[in-house]
C-alpha cells in the first residue's frame, strides 16, 4: 500500500512519497526570457538561443520560437523538454484539425486557449509542464499576443516578456511601446530589451533570433548577435581615486 | 569543586549566544519575525561634474505602505550622501553611526571627509555582522580626489561603478540605465535620467512608490532636491470636506483641585546597633 504524504511546498520542489516519482519536480535544461510585442503588421518575438543546464551553458543552438500552423508563433522559456512535448501536442492538434478538411485553420486565440487548458490541468495534477509560453499570431487581419505560465495563469497584452524579461524588459516596453510601430522600430525596441537582458541576465547569450508573423506568414530571422559597449572609464579603472578598495 | 560563574561583560560586537536556540526553533517550525524593509528603488550615477543620487519615498511593512514620503537619502558629510535600501532601522542606524564617525574624524584631521573613508567604515561594520545588518547602500560624493560612486551590500562587499541601482526596484531602474546611460552627461541630462529610472522603479515595482528624491553633489556644492518629482499626487479630494458629528455640548465643568501636599515629619527611633 503506498502511503501518500501531503505535498509540502518547499520553494521550487515538491516532496512526495517515493513510489510516485513520475512528476516534474524541477527543471533541468532551461531557456531564459522571451520578449514579444505587437506592431503594425502583426507580432514580433525575440529570444536567444541558449539552453542552460543549471549554471552551465550547455546548448547554444536551441530554437525557442516555433511556427504553429499558418497563423501562430509559439515561444517558450523554461524546461526545453516540456516545450518539445508541447510542440508534439500542438502537432497532433493541428493534424486532427486538418483532417476535417473544411478550409478552417486554428488561429492564435484557439491555440492559446488550448494551451491554457493543458497547462492548468497539468498543474492541478501537481505535474506541471515547466514553461512560460508566449503565443503570438495574426488571423483575419487581427493580431493577437498572449502568455500562459506553468501554473495556468493566462492573459493577453500588447507586449509580454517571460522570466527575467518581466523585470528588465517590461519597464522599457511600458514606457516606449505604442500602437502601430513600424517593423524597424519594433526590431529596435526588441533589441534594446534584449541588450539589457544580455548585460544583466546570467543565463542570456549573445545569439538571438527575431521572429515575425504577419497575415502573409511566419519569418524567423537567422541568428545574430548584438553590439555591446564596455568602454566606460569607470570599468577600465574602477579604483582610481579609491586606492585599495574593490 | 567550586562552581563560580563570573559574569564577564560582552566585549562588543554581535553576540552569537542565541543562534543555536534560534536554529532549534526554526527546525521545530517556528517562523522568524520579518523585518520592516524599505522595498526600494535607489540609484546613483556619475555625470560630468559630480554625482547624482536618487531614491523613491515608500516604506513598506509587508503588504502595507508604512510611510508614503520617507527620506532614503541620508546625510553622511557635507560632500557625501548615502541612499539606503533594506531594513529601514538598519540603514538609518548604520548611516547615522558612520556620519558621526566621519564628523569626529574631520575634527581630528582638519580635512574634508573622503568617500572611501565612509566606504571603509561602512564595509567593515557590515562585514563584521555577517549580513545580519540588512543594509544595502548606494554611497556617493565628491571629495578632493574627485567624484565617487559605490554600492555596498549587506554582507560587506562593495563595487565602484559609473551607475548603480539597489533595492527591489533595482532591475526596473537598471534597465533604464543600461539602455540610456552615456559618459559625460550634463547636470540636467543626469537629473532627467535619474528621475526616469526612479519612476521606472516606482511604476513597475510594487515595493517602490510615491515621489522621487534627488541629490546632486558637485565640487564644493550640494543640492538636496526633496520631492523633486511627485508623479502620484492625490487626485481626488472630496468637495464635501470632512463633517464631524453634531456639535459637542458641554454638560458640566468641574474643577477638582489636587490634594494639598502634606509633609509628615515623624520622629523615628534611632537605629539599633
From Swiss-Prot, chain B:
Similarity comment: family membership: Belongs to the peptidase T1B family.
EC numbers: 3.4.25.1
GO molecular function ontology, one term from the record: threonine-type endopeptidase activity
Coiled coil start-end: none
UniProt source species: Arabidopsis thaliana
Keywords: Cytoplasm, Hydrolase, Nucleus, Protease, Proteasome, Threonine protease, Zymogen
Residues forming the catalytic site: 40
Subunit-structure text: Component of the 20S core complex of the 26S proteasome. The 26S proteasome is composed of a core protease (CP), known as the 20S proteasome, capped at one or both ends by the 19S regulatory particle (RP/PA700). The 20S proteasome core is composed of 28 subunits that are arranged in four stacked rings, resulting in a barrel-shaped structure. The two end rings are each formed by seven alpha subunits, and the two central rings are each formed by seven beta subunits. The catalytic chamber with the active sites is on the inside of the barrel.
Annotated GO biological process: proteolysis involved in protein catabolic process
Catalytic activity field: Cleavage of peptide bonds with very broad specificity
Residue ranges annotated as propeptide in the record: 1-37
Alphabetized InterPro entries for the sequence: Ntn_hydrolases_N, Pept_T1A_subB, Proteasome_bsu_CS, Proteasome_sua/b, Proteasome_suB-type
Function description: The proteasome is a multicatalytic proteinase complex which is characterized by its ability to cleave peptides with Arg, Phe, Tyr, Leu, and Glu adjacent to the leaving group at neutral or slightly basic pH. The proteasome has an ATP-dependent proteolytic activity.
Record's GO cellular component terms: cytosol; nucleus; proteasome complex; proteasome core complex, beta-subunit complex
Name of this chain's protein: Proteasome subunit beta type-7-A
Gene of this entry: PBB1
Membrane spanning residue stretches: none
